[in-house]
């Protein structure tokens, strides 16, 4: 199941739709997660242009009144059969089955809070839900926190946010999926950080052909 994740920073522009469609077609994407979409109305009708066909389904979390946030998960219904949907103000969690492998699992798209308190509360909410679901997990997200000081330019110590993120990953038995080709996923002027990442459990790693 080929997955695409993108902090799109606003989905309103037409060229973004064409870029998404190109990725979906070239990489044969069957699951897509978008965050910071800033959309306040359903884009279900627009998704056909992005996906390229009608064999898809979506789940949406709208942006706030200040046009912040927004999360979208979209998937190929021929590949991934969703049986249950969960969502919060900045995340979507889908229970389902990867059809070709008869692999029951849980796939999530997450956009972390900028502030530590909000992020910690979201992590706790997600942890309780994922432990209750008790299925192999794959999470794609911009968590708005780094895991190690080396993931942020000019960061030299492990702060409280990093420790909480690390403990959350350990509590859920997740593995940080290595990135290839890029070291940082966010930049502003001279500031650079690795905020976007994929996390999965051992069962996903053992079934890497999925």
Per-range role (PLM):
Residues 1-210:
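A shared catalytic/ligand-binding motif for oxyanion handling
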